[in-house]
Amino acid sequence: MAQKINPISFRLGTTQVWNSTLQIYGKSFKNYFSIVNNQLNLQNFIIRYVKLNGFQINYYEWKMHKNKTFLSIYFSPSFNNGKLNLTNFKQLSNLLSNWCSNKFIFHFYLNSKWSLTSNFLTLYTKYLVEQKLGPKKIIVILCNFLQDQLNSSKVMHFKFGFIETKLVGFKIRLVGRFDSSNQMAKSFDQTIGTLSLTNLSSFVEYSNIEIHTKLGTCGVQVWLFFTPKKFINGYNQKNS
């Protein structure tokens, strides 16, 4: 059976939804390029500013209503940040307001605790690598953490609304050169639980990140597998 590295596109329109519904059919490509370019520049600036002040971006939410764009930014403390100094976020808000027109509204939300996402796990892996831990130890730490989280509940965005899911499995892959005595790259994989990339009734979160070390570039890939547990807003499986 076919196996996809990023299985999210396999489920678009069935269980998972698009991050954006912006369409360019019949429209000028120049306008689309300008929008995407400005969005990426804005997100890159926010990520660098937030990281400089000891925090990490958790995720974004873009919404448009009555010719106004609302950007909600959810951030969490870095793993080595023991103090929560939020004074610089007022300066960031002023910078963004001056940079963008009055049609852009920014909201900042502090998540004092990280939620279980694939993005969180890749950032945590990067932190462990920066602490100069070996790849096998990193895999053990991540697996022990995720094993404690198996069957835990999480609310996710379903195509008909929100749904409560449970974590049923995960897969972690670490690829790169970690040993100075060996010139060849190595791959470390660990899988636990139910891992079906082709099951359309499941939810999959995928994330990857590149880590730059003195020995070269390392790649981290994380898959989290969820199954429906409880449908919200009066929806049930019989209606699907």
From Swiss-Prot:
One of its GO terms (cellular component) is ribonucleoprotein complex. Coiled coil: none annotated. Keywords: Mitochondrion, Ribonucleoprotein, Ribosomal protein. It is found in: Mitochondrion. Gene3D superfamilies: Ribosomal protein S3, C-terminal domain. SUPFAM superfamilies: Prokaryotic type KH domain (KH-domain type II) (SSF54814), Ribosomal protein S3 C-terminal domain (SSF54821). Its main location: mitochondrion. GO terms for molecular function: RNA binding. Belongs to the universal ribosomal protein uS3 family. This is Small ribosomal subunit protein uS3m.
